[in-house]
Swiss-Prot record:
Family, similarity comment: Belongs to the orthohepadnavirus protein X family.
Keyword set includes Transcription regulation: yes
Post-translational modification comment from the UniProt entry: A fraction may be phosphorylated in insect cells and HepG2 cells, a human hepatoblastoma cell line. Phosphorylated in vitro by host protein kinase C or mitogen-activated protein kinase. N-acetylated in insect cells.
Protein name listed in UniProt: Protein X
One BP annotation, GO: DNA-templated transcription
Stretches the record annotates as Mitochondrial targeting sequence: 68-117
Length: 154
């Protein structure tokens, strides 16, 4: 059974918030700019983090009742193709952190919904699917290959 996450845009903070469908929480944004190094200590995750569930490549914090601590995901598989009509997604997101016009928040929200969640649900865990977490998360890649640097992996 694939995990279902809700992707919601918070325009006030200009971040995408992910949370398990049906959860009461709106999720926790990871403070700091995109691509920042992870904090020195791991984020606190409640004991009901859903480790007993089939994660299928999702970070263990995705099932936390407080919401996942990592909010921004993309798929290396999509970045290897020409499906992304906006060009190189890491460059686009990096430009947004600098305050430059690149991709609208609506386009970003649609990109994450269409490219990431559909792959998790339809394809599940596979060798070519690597999950990148922008901003860092100590719980990322629990079922995936060795982590890569997002901004140098495209």
């Amino acid at each position: 059974m694939a995990a279902r996450l809700c992707c919601q845009l918070d325009p006030a903070r200009d971040v995408l918030c992910l949370r398990p469908v049906g959860a009461e929480s709106r999720g926790r944004p990871f403070p700091g700019p995109l691509g920042a190094l992870p904090p020195a200590s791991p984020p606190v995750v409640p004991t009901d983090h859903g480790a007993h569930l089939s994660l299928r490549g999702l970070p263990v914090c995705a099932f936390s009742s407080a919401g996942p601590c990592a909010l921004r995901f993309t798929s290396a598989r999509r970045m290897e193709t020409t499906v992304n009509a906006h060009g190189n997604l890491p460059k686009v997101l990096h430009k947004r952190t600098l305050g430059l016009s690149a991709m609208s928040t609506t386009d970003l929200e649609a990109y994450f919904k269409d490219c990431v969640f559909n792959e998790w649900e339809e394809l599940g865990e596979e060798v070519r699917l690597k999950v990148f977490v922008l901003g860092g998360c100590r719980h990322k890649l629990v079922c995936s290959p060795a982590p890569c640097n997002f901004f140098t992996s495209a």
